[in-house]
Amino acid sequence: MCIRRQQPGLLELEHGGRRWRLGINICEDLWVEEELHGQRLRGGDPVGELQALRPDLLLNLSASPFAQGKAQLRRRLAAAAAARLGCPVVYVNQVGGNDELVFDGGSFVVAATGAVRLQLDWAEPDLQVWDTALDPARTTIPLPDPEDLLLRTLVLGLRDYARKCGFRRALLGLSGGIDSALVAVLAAAALGPGNVQALLMPSPWSSAGSIEDSLALAQRLGIATGTVPIAALMAGFDAALNEPLAGPPAGLTAENLQSRIRGTLLMALANQQGQLLLSTGNKSELAVGYCTLYGDMNGGLAVIGDLYKTSVFRLCAWIDSPAAAACRQALGLPAEGELVGGAIREKPPSAELRPDQRDSDSLPDYDQLDPLLKALIEEQRSPEELIATGTDAALAERVQGLLRRAEFKRRQAAPLLKVSNRAFGSGWRMPIAAAG
């Protein structure tokens, strides 16, 4: 770990007939309370060093990217500093997306009592005035729902990524599943429904329900759709490969061909029409390799590549709840009724690459898989540690093996929007050849 260190500063100025002593520190200079954060990110004690300077106010200048649960932690760290210094803390955070990182804003003022007295907007530029003369009440401004913060952050990340890469329009494949449905919602909010196109690519194994659900979702969002059936293309590949394979492709080869046919169609349309192709895979799939190189992994941005499947279900359930109405309206989405839809949220996950296929045919149930993945990835625990605390040994070793063997796919994956403490991409460096 690289420890960055800045000397605490003090700025003195005249205002309102009195002399003010403003303490100044940078971002993780606040992160010195190991009992709050779990680790000490700074050498020394930048907050303690400011105590001798007796500031009237501490200004913390941050460029702190979003991670789930981090908003509450920032408040706790700022409140701890305010209590030690006996003065308010003004926490000022950057807002905007920069590649994988999304800076979610949410600047605030916490009084010496620990109460949050001013809260600026999330995932949007904001400017407000705080009157230091007001008596700091002990009541605090509550945080928004965690799903509200997550939704706004993903929308901001997608919008800024597209804008900074020179794209106004986006394309995605719409399958009738929950992952592509969530990406469609995010794209409509980030770019406007008129700038989003969804392509349906049904195969002989696609259910009528998946097609109907996709079209209904697109209608609710107001996004354009197109349909290109892939049965004839599948037959063409079967014929072309029949002689060299001594028979048509079968099993996993045939399934991957379907995904690659779809990926090629999407890339061709995006290329011809000048659109940003959005990959719709989730973190669970990327972790265990339940995805196809040059197929469903195609895209310029993996919008939900840092969301586990269970998190996708949870966020979609919140989006469809009355609690999301204000957030949806603020993002330019319809405020009433379901967006994702119960039919999509409640269907068993399936890639529909063979008859009656379910994700659970190849993987543990996501309720089992995702906590294990989080322990292995974010918490950096070993299978031995998990087994010692009661995890089934065969399951822990199987999931660890899947995680290691999928590294070659992740190395070629599209960049994603980081919303956890440890995401795949630039913050994840593992060897490909250590998968045995």
Task: Specify the residue positions occupied by each region the protein language model found.
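ATP/NTP-dependent adenylation/nucleotidyl-transfer catalytic domains that generate, transfer
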Residues: 20, 86-87, 112, 138-175, ...
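Enzyme catalytic cores with a strong preference for nitrogen-chemistry domains
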Residues: 1-173, 189-190, 225
